[in-house]
Structure formats: structure tokens, C-alpha cells
């Protein structure tokens, strides 16, 4: 049991080795909290596949940090005059971001979660950097060191690029939409991508609040209305719940 997503999202060979070794040793592998903390994301997907459903698309907001950032920066209801850099600073102060916000803004955390889901859906994704990932780190700031001084420089200079994010938000608003940072998997096309997309304001993704996650499973069985898993996708309490639930499953299997 582990909530650590790195082993399950690294090289495909490692993924195969983990499950091959588990099968050989008749061991159990549970990693529900690697995606969505305590939300039943992996178990829902595994159940769909195990019962013979055909998963065609998976789409959602997989980062509590990025959910908070865009729900605050570009709310679906009302308006916000907040600058992008100010929202990032607020999220950092509230503890929503990693100590270095670039670890959230580079999109790699979302990419790792998409890699795990894609593999469970039957796609042999080589690595989390094997598909398009849109980074929200301005190119001019990407090379700053990861030291405390580098983080300070990043936060100090981020306001220089507020206009870029404002233009993206304005472009969405002119179309009657909002911008969100999402991950999507097109299973038949074997296409995985992570980045910004525009959504209608009355869509489930646009209507998220706070730092909630939402994951939609489009399948042959569910048709046009996807199976949706939504709720808090980050935090110690919900992550601990996910790990504890895995532990209970192991205990039940061993009894």
C-alpha cells in the first residue's frame, strides 16, 4: 500500500516489474491514493475494466492546487480581478502549493496521475513525459534554481507575466467560457495530454469549488453521461483515508 505515485508512473518497465513481482510472490498491490487522495478513482476505473466496460475517455481536474488557482482566478460565477501572481501567492500562503510552486505549475504531478490512469485503462504509456504537458511556468523563469533564493526570485518576478494569463482568461470569457487546467485520455486514439482548456460555464469542471478534484469516466456502458468522481483530492486527512481503506482491503483478503 502506498500513496506514492512515482513508482507507478515512472518507466513502463518498472510498472510491469511491480505487478509481475507481486503476482509471482502472490502479493497484493494497492495504491488508490496515488490519484485523487481518498477519492475512489482507481477502484472505479478498475471496476469498470474488470466488469467488461469499454472506457473511451477520461477527463478531469487532477490537482487540488491548480483547481484552487483557476477557480479563484477565473470563477464560473461572478468575476475576479485578481492577478495570476497574486492567486499563486495566496495558494502558497494557504499551503495549497508545494514549497516551490513550480512543482505544481509544471504539470508533472498531473501527468503522473494521467500515466497511472492510462495504464490501468490499457494504454502502455512509456513515461509521464511521453505526451504533451503544458507548463504554466514562464520560460524566462524556468531556469531559476530550486533553492530558497530561487523560489523567492520566482515569486518576485511572476507578476511580470500576469498579462499572459490575463489574456488567456479574457479569451475564454469572450467565448462565454472559463479556462481550466485538465488532463485527458482518449483511449481509442491512445492520446494523453495535460494542459489548459476552455469549458462552458455550466459544465461540471467549470463549476468546481475550492481545491476539489473531478474525474469523468466516459464509457460504452455509461454512454453520453459519464461516471463522475468528485471531491477533495488533496490533504492529509483524505489521503490517510485512502491508505486506510487500502489497508482494510488487505486485511479482508488475508482473513
Residue positions per predicted region:
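Rossmann-fold NAD(P)-binding glycine/threonine-rich loop
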Residues: 4-48
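NAD(P)-dependent dehydrogenase/reductase Rossmann-like domain
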Residues: 30, 34, 38-55, 59-60, ...
Amino acid at each position: 500500500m502506498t500513496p506514492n505515485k512515482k513508482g507507478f508512473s515512472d518507466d513502463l518497465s518498472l510498472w510491469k516489474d511491480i505487478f509481475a513481482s507481486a503476482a509471482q510472490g502472490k502479493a497484493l498491490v494497492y495504491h488508490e491514493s496515488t490519484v485523487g487522495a481518498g477519492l475512489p478513482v482507481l477502484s472505479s476505473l478498475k471496476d469498470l475494466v474488470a466488469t467488461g466496460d469499454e472506457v473511451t475517455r477520461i477527463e478531469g481536474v487532477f490537482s487540488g492546487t491548480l483547481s484552487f488557482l483557476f477557480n479563484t482566478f477565473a470563477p464560473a460565477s461572478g468575476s475576479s480581478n485578481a492577478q495570476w501572481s497574486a492567486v499563486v501567492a495566496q495558494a502558497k500562503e494557504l499551503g495549497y502549493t508545494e514549497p516551490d510552486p513550480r512543482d505544481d505549475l509544471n504539470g508533472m504531478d498531473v501527468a503522473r496521475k494521467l500515466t497511472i490512469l492510462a495504464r490501468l485503462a490499457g494504454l502502455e504509456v512509456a513515461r509521464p513525459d511521453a505526451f504533451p504537458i503544458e507548463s504554466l511556468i514562464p520560460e524566462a523563469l524556468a531556469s531559476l534554481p530550486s533553492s530558497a533564493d530561487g523560489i523567492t526570485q520566482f515569486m518576485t518576478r511572476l507578476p511580470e507575466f500576469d498579462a499572459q494569463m490575463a489574456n488567456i482568461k479574457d479569451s475564454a470569457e469572450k467565448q462565454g467560457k472559463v479556462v481550466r487546467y485538465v488532463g485527458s485520455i482518449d483511449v481509442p486514439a491512445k492520446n494523453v495530454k495535460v494542459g489548459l482548456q476552455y469549458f462552458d460555464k455550466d459544465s461540471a469542471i467549470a463549476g468546481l469549488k475550492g481545491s476539489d478534484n473531478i474525474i469523468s469516466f466516459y464509457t460504452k456502458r455509461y454512454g453520453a453521461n459519464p461516471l463522475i468522481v468528485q471531491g477533495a483530492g488533496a490533504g492529509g486527512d483524505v489521503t490517510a483515508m485512502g491508505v486506510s481503506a487500502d489497508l482494510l482491503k488487505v486485511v479482508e483478503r488475508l482473513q
